[in-house]
Amino acid sequence: MSIVENILSLRERFTAKLQKANIFDNFFMRVVLENKEVCQYVLRKLLKKPDIIVLDCKTEVQISKLFGKDSRLDVLATDKTGKIFNIEIQKAKEDAHELRVRYYHSAVDSEIIRKGKEYSDLPPVYVIYVSKTDIWEKGSAVYMVEKSLKYHGKADIYDDKQYTLYVNAEVKDNSEQDISALMEYFKICNPDDDTHGALSEYVRYLKTDKKGNDIMYDEFEREFEGDIRKRTKADDIAKIMLDFKVSFERALKTLDIPEEEHDDYAELLRYFYPNVMQ
């Protein structure tokens, strides 16, 4: 698809995509789960802790570099007791899940220490790894990691305040009906389904209300912000050409536009400013 087609069809594509959008779509997830009431509802359901009170919730959190690698967490929340919750939504088929979770724990701890906390003050951190498929292939919707301290053939609970929960949307688990129902909703996000409290309310608002649609369109545009930025820059090129009566090439040079982008701008100006490009 050309850059012009990309820009012209953006609203049309958005309308179709929004109706099918679910929590496994990044542009939808980052809006839905940043809502504090929604985040609280989801955490209470997944952790079976109805008393969680979320004070702060952010999505796509960029944190300081860890071992030279940029770290971005899908959802990072804090409750009133100081506990930290990291929810990671895995859509694609990946491997080394346990190493990914180890990295998420390290990233969160690294950020806490960077902000001046002592080791003894490290709060409990929960990493909740949500996947579309049953990555462990054991037929369960939920997997809880428990650490133990082994000695003389015995084993005691080893509590380092790092907790890991794996949840998947593939298995319909009769022993985890509430979580399975939530995962089913994650996959569909039907605005007519009102069975999931704050989550259902916000999804319905985003999908059916004009103001909610506008919020989602702004988020959807982020995925195409490079093309949209070029569209704005094309206006600048045309203005320079008209005001100063210079060539297309001269306008590009004035704005210091890289040579590899020249064809895109030529296409944009031919479409939006055909008289200028004659």
Where are these regions (language model features)?
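Low-complexity, glycine/alanine/valine/leucine- and proline-rich hydrophobic stretches
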Residues: 151-161, 165, 178, 182-189
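Extended serine/threonine-enriched, polar tracts that run as long, contiguous segments within proteins
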Residues: 168-170, 174
